[in-house]
Amino acid sequence: MKGKVIQVMGPVVDVEFDGYLPEINEAIDVTLADASKDRLVLEVAAHIGDSRVRTIAMDMTEGLVRGQECIATGGPIKVPVGEAVLGRIFNVIGDPVDEGSAIPADTERWSIHRSAPTFEEQSTKTEMFETGIKVVDLLAPYSKGGKVGLFGGAGVGKTVIIMELIHNVAFKHSGYSVFAGVGERTREGNDLYHEMKDSNVLDKVALCYGQMSEPPGARNRIALTGLTMAEYFRDEKGLDVLMFIDNIFRFAQSGSEMSALLGRIPSAVGYQPTLASEMGKLQERITSTSKGSITSVQAVYVPADDLTDPAPASVFAHLDATTVLNRKIAEKGIYPAVDPLDSTSRILSADIIGQEHYNTARGVQSVLQKYKDLQDIIAILGMDELSESDKLVVARARKIERFLSQPFFVAEVFTGSPGKYVELKDTIAGFQGILDGKYDNIPEMAFYMVGGIDEVLAKAEKMK
């Protein structure tokens, strides 16, 4: 059905149809006069009477004029799904933007607006998702189909952890990953692509980018584009998929821009009145079903470090685990710089992960907490003034700190040390051994940047 543009206000375009009214979220293709430009897609956001609709553009609207012809597609934006999307970069409308070959015409396409799985379809059992990263598996374990918040400032290693997770999922669980770059820097997207290529994980991941420079419609809907690709692998292939969203804050931010452009009355701090329901709609689609699961890791930018800001606060309600990266730990040279006392997980309970794992995790945390409490005394009076039992706690805590570091596969290029995937049972055995005092006579440097405890013993032998 044809219509015509009647008004353009930045990324908001009003379109008039003759005797036809497109549905909300329907995609409208604009016929551009300049054939060299990519196609422009509008998405219906509101009905404004008299067969007119207000739409949000998924790309820049430069060169758009009144009276320009539009075609209603009869359905929402549809993006390619399946094996064809792996190793490629897509924009919000599902077109490849990596200068590679076109997506085959017979590739299946799914609508980006989908319902969340029903209660009957959802899986009720809680299972741990093993990542092979010691600090995560021991202290803040991820659950299959769970949502993890990744908190950290610039340059503390968020991207490296994301890439390591993609690597481990591909090689240990032979699963696929989907990465949605929501409103982040173009340079970071480019770097990530090349780093993945160098680390040999690219052919197991689909990338969807809606960068900072793009209009709010593209930045908002790109999260749905990526999620749709992940849902296909879960529902049709029965796989456990990893879904990365970097950055979930930008999803809320772009929604707020769209809301203002559409003239809705803002709510707290200028955010859209529908913030909680928009976030809920996205997050409810990320879950485990009887067929497979989508486990998501979402980087969360906290504006001005204010955790009560409505955008991060709306994310917290949905998270099952948090992985907090700490600059002080990174400064000590301990990578991954995960804060063992700040990171939390809903499934860190004896009923789900078992008594042994639970006791070891809590034991490690209590030793680290005691060490933290003693640091003021050490700074003022020095180690010699501590009691013998406190000296032992400090020695074990320092070993635990070093043992929480681990060489990554994707960082082999920079560090020169081969990456390690540590099975959960080895992680638990190693830390329990430190707590029990089995390794009190081994120097702490032997625990630094190794995999399992057997490597510590081998390293200690070499150091003699």
Swiss-Prot record:
It catalyses: ATP + H2O + 4 H(+)(in) = ADP + phosphate + 5 H(+)(out). Keywords: ATP synthesis, ATP-binding, Cell inner membrane, Cell membrane, CF(1), Hydrogen ion transport, Ion transport, Membrane, Nucleotide-binding, Translocase, Transport. One of its GO terms (cellular component) is plasma membrane. It holds the Pfam family ATP-synt_ab. Gene3D superfamilies: 2.40.10.170, Bovine Mitochondrial F1-atpase, Atp Synthase Beta Chain, Chain D, domain 3, P-loop containing nucleotide triphosphate hydrolases. One of its GO terms (molecular function) is ATP binding. It is an enzyme of class 7 (translocase). Transmembrane segments: none annotated. It is a peripheral membrane protein. Produces ATP from ADP in the presence of a proton gradient across the membrane. The catalytic sites are hosted primarily by the beta subunits. F-type ATPases have 2 components, CF(1) - the catalytic core - and CF(0) - the membrane proton channel. CF(1) has five subunits: alpha(3), beta(3), gamma(1), delta(1), epsilon(1). CF(0) has three main subunits: a(1), b(2) and c(9-12). The alpha and beta chains form an alternating ring which encloses part of the gamma chain. CF(1) is attached to CF(0) by a central stalk formed by the gamma and epsilon chains, while a peripheral stalk is formed by the delta and b chains. This is ATP synthase subunit beta.
